[in-house]
């Protein structure tokens, strides 16, 4: 919004040309989202408290968590508010990638809001049924996957539509340009062609998988938000590189026109996340709830797909992956041993993984900070793939 206004007025005020610099707008988006969160945070907490939207805590969880019962949840609305305002103010609103990322983020946010609302109203930690939640995630994820299959390879919506129609006329069997290939980290000029269907399936799995992985990780005060900020900032760097014809050519990455604008979105997400952490650090004054976790995970997955760094997201988001795998392994092993031995056995003391470490004697703050450190190292490792190829 401000970019369009500055471009309109820059002939009369040359200093407004600074708005054309992506890095300047990224910094301002971070500051804007951060200030919105810090200023509005206390009011959001008071409102959530007045609405009596307290978190229902699992009775079978660590006993130290029982004191958290009643802490306001649905604090993710504060994050989404900061992201929305900062992105709308500082991003180029004619950019197609901004709108598809916003659609996924706020679409998943709505799903999370409904889930949180049911938890609060019915005092049930389970919320929406897994089937219902998965259905609506799939609707949004598949829509985004189909659109992105064609938009990452073309520079305008008109050409995106032309490519889509060419695919339809080919009997849904046409391939995609090299820009849509699956990129392999640490390898130069080698990628795996996915085709339209392969791209759609992979994108769907990345977006929905990232959303649920972040949601599973959100179980301790401050645990999930800092990894989201770190991974989001790292993806913002990739977006800046892929969106630049100069840097992408120098680093031997495909140039994806318009992807650089996602740096603004990632910056807004980082600022909003840090503001939320101010109130979510131990002992938390509010929890983000599914409205925040599902939305942020979907956002990370969508950005990773656009900048063609699905595998790097898997690396940088290693904490999210480990948390998800711990749940899958726990459930699978329990069912297998119950069939085999007549009683279910557990691989971990409790899943997700952060609860296992809590029950192993780690304090909550130790788990959180150590997971942050691991994520920082993984993000630095992921960023090294920019040059080590």
From Swiss-Prot:
It is found in: Cell inner membrane. The chain crosses the membrane at residues 25-45, 73-93, 97-117, 135-155, 190-210, 222-242, 259-279, 287-307, 311-331, 366-386. Its cofactor is Mg(2+). It is a multi-pass membrane protein. CDD domains: GT_MraY. This is Phospho-N-acetylmuramoyl-pentapeptide-transferase. InterPro entries: Glycosyl_transferase_4 (IPR000715), PNAcMuramoyl-5peptid_Trfase (IPR003524), PNAcMuramoyl-5peptid_Trfase_CS (IPR018480). Signal peptide: none annotated. Keywords: Cell cycle, Cell division, Cell inner membrane, Cell membrane, Cell shape, Cell wall biogenesis/degradation, Magnesium, Membrane, Metal-binding, Peptidoglycan synthesis, Transferase, Transmembrane, Transmembrane helix. NCBIfam families: mraY. The keyword Cell wall biogenesis/degradation applies. The lineage of its organism: Bacteria, Pseudomonadati, Pseudomonadota, Betaproteobacteria, Burkholderiales. Pathway: Cell wall biogenesis; peptidoglycan biosynthesis. It comes from the Bacteria. One of its GO terms (cellular component) is plasma membrane. Coiled coil: none annotated. It catalyses: UDP-N-acetyl-alpha-D-muramoyl-L-alanyl-gamma-D-glutamyl-meso-2,6-diaminopimeloyl-D-alanyl-D-alanine + di-trans,octa-cis-undecaprenyl phosphate = di-trans,octa-cis-undecaprenyl diphospho-N-acetyl-alpha-D-muramoyl-L-alanyl-D-glutamyl-meso-2,6-diaminopimeloyl-D-alanyl-D-alanine + UMP. The keyword Cell division applies. Its EC number is 2.7.8.13. Catalyzes the initial step of the lipid cycle reactions in the biosynthesis of the cell wall peptidoglycan: transfers peptidoglycan precursor phospho-MurNAc-pentapeptide from UDP-MurNAc-pentapeptide onto the lipid carrier undecaprenyl phosphate, yielding undecaprenyl-pyrophosphoryl-MurNAc-pentapeptide, known as lipid I. GO terms for biological process: cell division; cell wall organization; peptidoglycan biosynthetic process; regulation of cell shape. One of its GO terms (molecular function) is phospho-N-acetylmuramoyl-pentapeptide-transferase activity. Belongs to the glycosyltransferase 4 family. MraY subfamily.
